Amino acid sequence: MLTLQTWLVQALFIFLTTESTGELLDPCGYISPESPVVQLHSNFTAVCVLKEKCMDYFHVNANYIVWKTNHFTIPKEQYTIINRTASSVTFTDIASLNIQLTCNILTFGQLEQNVYGITIISGLPPEKPKNLSCIVNEGKKMRCEWDGGRETHLETNFTLKSEWATHKFADCKAKRDTPTSCTVDYSTVYFVNIEVWVEAENALGKVTSDHINFDPVYKVKPNPPHNLSVINSEELSSILKLTWTNPSIKSVIILKYNIQYRTKDASTWSQIPPEDTASTRSSFTVQDLKPFTEYVFRIRCMKEDGKGYWSDWSEEASGITYEDRPSKAPSFWYKIDPSHTQGYRTVQLVWKTLPPFEANGKILDYEVTLTRWKSHLQNYTVNATKLTVNLTNDRYLATLTVRNLVGKSDAAVLTIPACDFQATHPVMDLKAFPKDNMLWVEWTTPRESVKKYILEWCVLSDKAPCITDWQQEDGTVHRTYLRGNLAESKCYLITVTPVYADGPGSPESIKAYLKQAPPSKGPTVRTKKVGKNEAVLEWDQLPVDVQNGFIRNYTIFYRTIIGNETAVNVDSSHTEYTLSSLTSDTLYMVRMAAYTDEGGKDGPEFTFTTPKFAQGEIEAIVVPVCLAFLLTTLLGVLFCFNKRDLIKKHIWPNVPDPSKSHIAQWSPHTPPRHNFNSKDQMYSDGNFTDVSVVEIEANDKKPFPEDLKSLDLFKKEKINTEGHSSGIGGSSCMSSSRPSISSSDENESSQNTSSTVQYSTVVHSGYRHQVPSVQVFSRSESTQPLLDSEERPEDLQLVDHVDGGDGILPRQQYFKQNCSQHESSPDISHFERSKQVSSVNEEDFVRLKQQISDHISQSCGSGQMKMFQEVSAADAFGPGTEGQVERFETVGMEAATDEGMPKSYLPQTVRQGGYMPQ
C-alpha cells in the first residue's frame, strides 16, 4: 500500500512539473549561485529559493528544505532560514575538489523531493610564471619555456606573447600536452631585440610573468658538427687526427668546440682542454694517446663568447693509434718442481701477457735467456707464456723480453737461486679484506730493499686442486687488490713473496673471502662418550667447500622431549664439547649450527640417551660387597682353623679307646683281653648282636628269682644312668647305629643309641649283704680321655641289698658312640631293638657263642660255660621277643655268679663300624 502511495505522489509531481505537450515546466525552485567555482579551503554559501506555486501545491515552505552533498544529508546546524521561500547552507574550509549539492523538500508522507542541484568546483588561482627562457635552434623557429607554478586543479591557459618595439606578434597559446612551452610561428631575426612574456589564466584569476628582452643571436643553439673522422699517424704512435664539418651558422657567429674521447672499453670520457678548441676550425690532433689503442671521439660547438647553447653531440667516431715497442717488461716468475734426475731440477718459467696499452702492438714472441752463474747463455724463443727447463742445482739468472712489429720491450730479470738457498725476510702484518667488491691485500714492507712482490692465490677446495694465479707488484707497493676473476663464497689462499736482488724471500700466506655467506650445511654432531650426567660430543670440521666463510663459532642446541632448549656457544677451533649437568636415563636431542659473519646453518638433529648408572658405579657397589663377603669368608675360615679343636670337640668328639684306659685296674681280677683278629673276620656280614654279659658271684646261693630281682634293679639303674655316661662311649663316625636291649615294660623310655659300647658291672662277694670296700684306682698314662668314673671315682658306689633278697649290684656304667641319625632319635622302642637282635643270622650266633665260651672257660669253668651256652642257644636267639632277650641277660648273670667269677667289663653292643676294645 505504501509503495502504491509513493508511486502516486511521484506521478503527481511529474504531472505538475510538465506541460501537456511534454515540455519541461519551470522547476519548483533554484540554487544561487548557479555554477560556482570556489577556492580550496575557503567558505561558501548557497541559497535555495522555492517558487510560490510549488509551495502552495505541496503546502511547504523554507522549513521543509533539506540540503544534501553527494547524497549525504547536511546537518541542520549549517542551515539558515532566510524567509518562508529561501534557505541557505554554509560550508567552511572546503577541501573537496568536486561537490554535488542538491536542494530537496519534504512532501506528503515525509518523502524527499529534489528541487534543484548544482556542482561546486574547487581549485586554486594560477601562480605567476617564472624562469621564462627562449632558445633559437639553428634553422628553426624560436621556442620558449617557463615554470607554470603549482597545480591549480582547474583548467589554466598559458599564452606566450612577444613583440618588437614597433610590432606585436601573434600570441602563442600552449597546448594541453605541453602547457609550459610554446614555439612561435614566425622566423627569427638576428641582431634585433625582442620582448617576451607569459600570461596564465583560469576561473579564479589571471597573472602575467616578468618580461624579458633579448637579441635572438644570443639564444642560438647551433647544429652539431657532422662527418667526424679519425686518422692515425705512422710517425707518431701517440696521436690521432680528427676532422669534421661545421654547421652553416658559422657564417653568422664564431664557434668554439668541445672534444671528448675514451678508450673503447672504458665508460668515462676524457676531454681536450677548452682553450685548445676555442676558435672555429674543422680539424684537431689529439696527442699523448697510448700506442696501439682504439679510441672513441665525439664533438660539439657553440657561440664563441659562451652566450647561447651548446649543440648536441656529434656522432661518435673511433680510431687506433699506431704500434710502438712494448712500454713495459712483462711480469716474470718461476716454479720449481722436483726432478727425477740426480743433480737437476725442473724449473717452470711463467710470465703474464702484457695488456694492450703496455704491449703497444701485436705481440710476436717472447725471448728467454738463462745464464748460469759464471757460465754460458741459453736462449729460448717462445710463443706461449711459460717455459719448462731442466736446470742444475746452481744459481741462474733469467731474462725475458717481449717483441712486436716495432721492437722489443725492456728485459725482465729474475734470479733463480741455488737449491741450498735459504729464503729470509718475509713481509710482516699481512692482511686481506674485501672492499668495493674487490679483495685487497695489505702488508708491511721489510727493511731490506725489495725489487718486486709476487702475489699468488688459489681457491681452496676439498674436491679440486689449488690452481694458482699470480700477479706482480712493484717493490714500492704495500697495498693492492687481486686482479682476477674472483668468486664469492670461495676461500682464497693468498701468498705474498718479496723478491730481492739475490732471490726470493720467505713467503707469507693468509686466507680471505671476497664475500662471505652462511654455510651450505651445518656440522654433524655425534657422541664420543656418554655418562650418567654428562656427554662428550664431537664433530668434524666443515669442508671448506661448504663453509662459505670463516667459521666464527659453533652453537650446540640440546633439549629433552619435554624440556626447554639450551644453547651453548663453542669456539670454532674446537671439535668436541662436554655437556654437563645432564639427567640420567634421559633422551636428549642435539643439533649444532655453524656461523660465519653472514649467518649460520643448522646441522641434522641427533639423539642419545644417558645411562641410568655411571661407568664404574655398579662395580663400585659390587666389588666392595664381594670383597666384604670374601673377607668375611676368609675371617670365618681363619677363625675355624684357629678354633678347630673346639669345633671338633662339639661336632666330632674323640672316642676313647677302652683298651688304653685304666678301667681294667678297677678290679684286682681283670679278665684277660681278647684279641680279635679283625672286626671284618668276626662279623663278615656286617651284623652282630647286642649282648649283655653279667658276671655273678659263683658262691652266691640266692635263689634265682632274687637274682632276677637284683638284675631288674640293675637294668633300671642302667636305663636311668644311660644318659649320664662318660665320654668313653662318645660318638665315632666309623660306627653305625644299633638298638639297646631293655625289658618289655620300659619300651617308652628306652633310647636308640647309635654305635654304643655298654658296660655292665656286677660286684660279687661272699657275703651278699656286706658292703664292699671302696676301690682305689690309679691314673693311666694313656692319652685317651678319661671315663666318667675315672674322672670322678667318688661316684662309684656299691649297692647293698638287705632283707629283701636283692643281690648287691654296683652302678652300671656304659659308654655311647653317636655319629649317625639315630643319635637324634633316642626314643626308639625296645621292640625295634629286639627285632634287630633277633635278626642275627646263624653264623653270627655261632661265632659269638664261641667267643663267649672261651671267655667263660677261663673264669668260671666248663660247668658254667655249658649252662651259658644252653641258655644262650635256647633263649637269646629264640623267636626274637623282648622277654627272651631279657632272659638271655638274666641267665648269663646267674651263670657268672654261681661260678664265683670276679667282676669284669665287656661291651654290650658292637655294631659294624663301631669301636671294639681288644
Curated annotation (Swiss-Prot):
The consequence of P498L is: In HIES4B; results in defective cytokine-mediated signaling pathway
Which biotechnological use is given in the entry?
A: Two extracellular parts of IL6ST/gp130 linked to the Fc-portions of a human IgG1 antibody (sgp130Fc) inhibit IL6 trans-signaling by the IL6:IL6R complex and has no affinity of IL6 or IL6R alone. Also blocks IL11 cluster signaling through IL11R.
Which ranges carry the Ig-like C2-type domain? 26-120
Q: Which GO terms describe its cellular component?
A: ciliary neurotrophic factor receptor complex; dendrite; external side of plasma membrane; extracellular exosome; extracellular region; extracellular space; interleukin-6 receptor complex; membrane
Where does the record place the region Disordered? Answer: 660-681, 722-758
Q: Glycosylated residues? A: N43, N83, N131, N157, N227, N379, N383, N390, N553, N564
Oligomeric and partner information: Component of a hexamer of two molecules each of IL6, IL6R and IL6ST; associates with the complex IL6:IL6R but does not interact with IL6. Forms heterodimers composed of LIFR and IL6ST (type I OSM receptor) which are activated by LIF and OSM. Also forms heterodimers composed of OSMR and IL6ST (type II receptor) which are activated by OSM but not by LIF. Component of a receptor complex composed of IL6ST/GP130, IL27RA/WSX1 and CNTFR which interacts with the neuroprotective peptide humanin. Interacts with HCK. Interacts with INPP5D/SHIP1. Interacts with SRC and YES. (Microbial infection) The homodimer binds two molecules of herpes virus 8/HHV-8 protein vIL-6.
Q: What is this protein called?
A: Interleukin-6 receptor subunit beta
Q: Say which species the protein is native to.
A: Homo sapiens (Human)
Source lineage? Eukaryota, Metazoa, Chordata, Craniata, Vertebrata
